Amino acid sequence: MITYKTDIKASLQSSESSMPVLAMCYDFDKTLTPDDMQAQGFIQSVGYDEEQIKQFWQESNQLAKKNDMDNNLAYMYKMIQEAVGRFYVTREKLMEYGNQVELYEGVRTWFERIREYGLEHGVCIEHYIISSGLKEMIEGTEMAKEGAFTKIYASAFMFDDKGVAVWPAQAINYTNKTQFLFRIQKGILDINDTGVNDYVKPEDQRVPFRNMIYIGDSDTDIPCMSLVNANGGHSIGVYDPVKKDKDKVYKMMRHHRIRYYAPADYTNGSKLDTLVKQIIRKTAAYEVLEGEYVHCKHEAEE
């Protein structure tokens, strides 16, 4: 079991210290894991064999199209419907499926390793999940249970008094993902807090976009990648290190959606590991200069 030395409360208080915060934001499916989380146990448990997993998604997408429905709401509805007569979809059940999810090599220890590297260089690292997948499944992973993430933003169910999923509580799609970057920027993490719309001076932003890293794998990450890129941050496209299909990251690179790409290999010394550590060192150096700028600016305005 990995012990996380920096808890969420301490991490959130770090903005009040002299240590700059670097927010690392991740998609989940095919970014931290090789496949969709639902396809790693749940879909099979409702009667689809390995050869029929694509059929589940096709039926879900057809449901969305037929009813002018959000694709994520459609798959959540279908999950509940397909489970009828088989088992109850409870938070605990979904967390069990999440615990079965296969992770890319190195992911299991990545978050604390990078956090410790940041602290060694005077940078507080916070890890965020921004995913269209299921929050309950992500919460079932070992690293989530151990406190790796400052916040998990993902689609989620509402549960009745018996603990059974009855309705979507939150649906995250590729466009509304960007709101969570603004929440992180301003330090307003509660999804119901309307303060995210308030103006915050650049020097008062808790995590300016230049201090964000967004790691994703596909078109659904483009709005977040573009927002981070356009504001001086770092967007990284990842691809499966086994299949080595770079078509998506090449396309994102040509269209200026990402600044870098690397295999989804999270082991110590990998290309991704080296790249992120370079960004951490750059952040540490830049924020010293930025602090001096803010000091001069405030003194001149007094």
Language model segments and positions:
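C-terminal cap/substrate-recognition subdomain and adjoining C-terminal extension
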Residues: 105-128, 132-302
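Alpha-helical substrate-recognition element adjacent to the catalytic core
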Residues: 2-161
